[in-house]
């Protein structure tokens, strides 16, 4: 990948110290995983490495993704990790995921019910997350690595949130600062806006402890930050927002292409299809919009995985009107590195996300970077609208109804046929405010000052 090789030079930045600051980055989901949070984790590790840090990533064992998650991998992503990043995969127990009785320990084989009860009790009393078994290997390995070559900083990204607990434990043990990055919320559901745990759960006790000691607490949008300020006001001054973004080294710097009027319009949804998406409103709106001359023969192509696990595929596929002859096609999954070509082949993009005010979605940044019309299919006033404000090719309704969705499709179709170089340039300029370098840069600088102030 020449564009990646060119980006990942080995030169130190001007004015850098002789010894690079060393960061331990705890990111359970990291390439080759294809989980949605991987892209932010990958970008963070790469950005810090490019800024002159010595980056060590602790992530899950490869077999977790390949065996226990049924090969939920995108191996092309591994090629996009900066070669200066060191990746370590501490071992762990797969108790919660192991289904092969031949792999059970003697006690679990002979007393499965008792074993399950003890495991559940242990979680409720210690840490309510299956990934807890990752912590011992992380702490053991990190302590040994630290005494060989000192870490200056720990950054943990969640979910899962055992990474936060490990960061807090290591920070106290090694007496170094740590920051936590909330890609998702820990104790409340971003989609239903309800608490995930009872108030007396260990999860709240751990979250309070983590936020009490963290040097910085990062969120992907201000809605999430405000929710946590209300619950943990003592940490408010250390809470910041680092938005998601997009990667020019993956998507390339697009060029204006005049509308192709000799073929039907191609609308595209690029991303994982999940049960939370408002698919009924999307396809009902599409059916109505098809009565417009510009959309009578248009295509709506779905690119991406159906859910995150094998059991998600069948029920999600049933919700796609593939047999109605209305131009809806499921094109299958694609590697991250294939995204550039798919965006180039698409005339307008469909931004369909769950309707919660705390949801941004990383995909919206790539959509804007394409310079193509974007059709919003979600409730109004979600966090993503803060990002889309100012994007000149954004089409959305006042409500999440089939009628409003249809109007947005029609407006986007007209824009796709009429877009000119000037409007395209304004759209791309807006997107450039959200490159990973733009969003991660100020955070990296704050972390550098933090390290320099404690060294």
Residue ranges and their predicted role:
Residues 102-153, 199, 203:
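Conserved nucleotide-sugar donor-binding subdomain of glycosyltransferases
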Residues 399-406, 417-448:
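A charged, aromatic-enriched C-terminal amphipathic alpha-helix characteristic of glycosyltransferases
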Residues 43, 125, 140-143, 162-165, ...:
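Membrane-proximal helix-turn-helix segments that form the acceptor-binding/catalytic region
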Residues 24, 259-277, 283-287:
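Conserved donor-binding/catalytic core segment of Leloir-type glycosyltransferases
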Residues 223, 245:
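Carbohydrate-associated surface elements
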Residues 2-95, 216, 437-438, 455:
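N-terminal subdomain of nucleotide-sugar transferases
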Residues 301-306, 310-338:
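Nucleotide-activated donor-binding/catalytic signature segment of Leloir-type glycosyltransferases, i.e.
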Residues 215, 325, 341-358:
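Acidic donor-binding loop of glycosyltransferase active sites
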């Amino acid at each position: 990948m020449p564009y990646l090789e060119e980006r990942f030079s080995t030169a130190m930045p001007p004015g850098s110290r002789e010894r690079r600051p060393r960061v331990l980055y705890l990111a359970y989901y990291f390439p080759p995983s294809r989980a949605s949070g991987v892209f932010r984790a990958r970008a963070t590790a790469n950005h810090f490495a490019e800024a002159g840090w010595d980056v060590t990533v602790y992530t899950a064992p490869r077999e977790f993704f390949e065996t226990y998650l049924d090969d939920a991998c995108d191996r092309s992503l591994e090629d996009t990790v900066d070669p200066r990043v060191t990746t370590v995969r501490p071992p762990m127990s797969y108790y919660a995921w192991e289904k092969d009785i031949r792999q059970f320990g003697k006690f679990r084989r002979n007393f499965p019910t008792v074993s399950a009860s003890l495991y559940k009790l242990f979680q409720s009393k210690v840490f309510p997350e299956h990934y807890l078994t990752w912590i011992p290997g992380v702490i053991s390995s990190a302590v040994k690595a630290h005494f060989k070559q000192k870490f200056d900083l720990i950054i943990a990204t969640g979910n899962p949130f055992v990474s936060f607990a490990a960061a807090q434990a290591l920070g106290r043990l090694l007496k170094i600062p740590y920051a936590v990055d909330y890609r998702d919320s820990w104790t409340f559901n971003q989609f239903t806006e309800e608490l995930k745990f009872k108030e007396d759960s260990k999860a709240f006790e751990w979250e309070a402890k983590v936020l009490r000691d963290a040097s910085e607490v990062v969120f992907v949008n201000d809605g999430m930050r405000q929710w946590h300020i209300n619950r943990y006001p003592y940490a408010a001054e250390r809470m910041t927002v680092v938005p998601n973004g997009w990667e020019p080294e993956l998507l390339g710097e697009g060029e204006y292409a005049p509308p192709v009027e000799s073929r039907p319009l191609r609308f595209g949804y690029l991303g994982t299809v999940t049960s939370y998406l408002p698919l009924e409103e999307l396809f009902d709106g599409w059916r109505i919009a098809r009565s417009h001359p510009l959309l009578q023969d248009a295509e709506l192509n779905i690119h991406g995985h159906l859910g995150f696990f094998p059991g998600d595929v069948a029920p999600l596929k049933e919700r796609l009107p593939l047999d109605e002859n209305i131009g809806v096609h499921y094109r299958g999954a694609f590697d991250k590195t294939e995204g550039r070509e798919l965006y180039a082949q698409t005339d307008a993009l469909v931004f369909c996300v769950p309707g919660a005010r705390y949801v941004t979605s990383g995909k919206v940044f790539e959509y804007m970077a394409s310079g193509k019309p974007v059709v919003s299919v979600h409730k109004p006033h979600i966090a993503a609208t803060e990002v889309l404000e100012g994007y000149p090719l954004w089409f959305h309704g006042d409500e999440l109804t089939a009628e409003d969705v249809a109007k947005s499709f029609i407006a986007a179709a007209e824009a796709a046929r009429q877009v000119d170089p000037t409007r395209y340039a304004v759209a791309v300029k807006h997107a450039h405010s959200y490159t990973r370098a733009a969003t991660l840069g100020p955070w990296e600088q704050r972390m550098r000052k933090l390290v320099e102030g404690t060294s």
